[in-house]
Amino acid sequence: MNKILVSWYFALFFCVFTALGQDSGSVESLLKLAQDNTAFFDTDFSGRYTVVQEKPGEGKNLTEAIMYRRDKTSQWTILVTGPSREKGKGYLQTDGTIWFYDPSDRRFTFTSARDKFQNTNANNSDFAPQFYYRDYQIESAQDVKLGALDCVLFTLNAKIDRVDYPKLKLWVTKKDGLIRKKEDYSLSGQLLRTTAIPSYQIVENNERKYSVPVSMLIVDNLRGKRIGEKMQYERTQISISNVSFSKVDNVVYTKSYLEMMGDL
């Protein structure tokens, strides 16, 4: 009986970590690479973001913004540039705190990584580095196809409480460690959000190449409306352009910068 149990546990471990013909170390290395690909610790980053939210039966809402990131110090700034009624609003993460600035009353209010960006289906944390390897434990990893892409499908459970979602599924392409799809789950296993990243742009800077999503589609699996006989969910598409890895002035990562830009 003991031999049967030992064999069963070994088979389970083998299926979880070597479904790809790899050992647990190589699976973990791929997850670490996927995490590293979401961050730019050796350089500043800036880009223009176009955020389009679509609510079933209500049409689309457009937000345009410029984002600045300095990942090595966990600082980022988002300046909203459109539409005109939203222009001048901004977000700032510094010293472990996220602030929202509204130029209409010149006030900063505290917000969090889990809060929605401009009332869309994107979290504030979606614009920052993702710590899948650091904050999650691998429950399983298996070799799968996502369209024509050869991927590893990771099922992850949070190791800490300070995460947006306690359970994740990640589709990571084996050849480059890029995330192509993500599903966010509650602790009970309910699907909350689905994110698709179909393509990346390669940007060179100082002889280094960085992979940045061309666009991301976030589907909120809790917020939707039945139209006819079909359930349609809210969705937000984020497109990224004008990417640069040039150094950004230190003042950009301050409250005074948002105040100054809000007055323009």
Label every model-predicted segment:
Residues L149-V252:
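Gly/Pro-enriched, hydrophobic low-complexity segments
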Residues S7-F17:
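Bacterial N-terminal signal peptides
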Residues G47, Q75-V80, I98-D102, F108-F110, ...:
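Short hydrophobic/aromatic-rich beta-strand segments that constitute the beta-sheet cores
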Residues F45-T77, T81-P83:
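N-terminal, post-signal-peptide region of Sec/Tat-exported proteins
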Residues T50-P56, T81-P83, Y101-P103, N157-K159, ...:
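A generic structural motif
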Residues Q22-D36, F40-T43, T50, T94-P166, ...:
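Flexible, processing/modification-adjacent segments and terminal tails
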Residues M1-L5:
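Positively charged n-region of N-terminal signal peptides that target proteins for export
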